[in-house]
Amino acid sequence: RLPIMKKMKNKYFLTISTCIFGLCLFLASGCSFISVSLVPPVEPLKETTVMGKGKEKVLIIEISGIISEEEKRGLAGISGEPDMVARIKEELKTAAKDKHLKAVILRINSPGGTVTASDMIYHEIEQFKKKTGNKVIACIMDLGASGGYYVAVSADKIVAHPTTVTGSIGVIMLNLSVEGLLQKIGVKDTSIKTGEHKDMGSPLKTMTEEERKIFQGILDNMYERFLSVIAENRKELTNEKLKSLADGRIYTARQALDYGLIDQIGYLDEAIELAKNEAGLTTARVIIYHRPGSYKNNIYSQLSNSSFSTINLLNIDLKTFVRSGTPSFMYLWAP
């Protein structure tokens, strides 16, 4: 029994000695702190062939969920992959360097998003087309409304699934007023400001008629921008016809085709064939860019498993875009 106790005692002292030695090393290093990242660094894009064969390529770019510059957040709010605008810019930049890439398909499933993010993606696609001369085809899946349609008109041709919902051409400002609620619980806004309209749009007060007119002027300007982008790319639409369509309503694929908002009703594989034809290709590999570690094996593979969860409009209104209390200008279908 004594030898066993002696061994245990030696083990105990060894453990204590190791801890003390480690502490001494830590103190000797000048109390340096070791930084440990909970999130692995974002790795460069990887190319995967999901269909076809040959040297020439057609790239599918996914535009799914709310269009914004907000980074996707993972567990405990930790930032995950880059925001949609940054990711699409990265994909287009990679595609522009590939001499074998001849066409791009925008696989759109979005109710829209912020005015600026929608316009930035539109601009990046336009710049890509000018730089490379490559054809771009938009294929709208379930939803391509408002900002989703804004992005789609950057394409040379727009294909919509038979069950697509599109349209919702217009601008909305998401804003809440909690003044009445605060009065009931005895809370009063005592903000100090330097100008009469400095706090316009604040949820802590009721919007005045003059403030409403100011906001309406801004929205009208953004609405005109939306119309000009459509008119520039859908030249068969007269100004009169376009304004009659752009009252915020949504359209089925059949209605959109009849009104000239899209070019064709079809499926994603038909959009791929159209892209090949537009690029003058008989055979081509269909590719997807993605981060290492994610499995992609067909043309419907998504970049993120959470893409559809971001189309929760209640979550948008109350969490993402109004959480700061400031108004948000949106090209968004938000019933």
Kindly give the residue locations of the regions a language model identified:
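Short gly/pro/ser/thr-enriched loop/turn and capping motifs at secondary-structure boundaries
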Residues: 145-146, 165-169
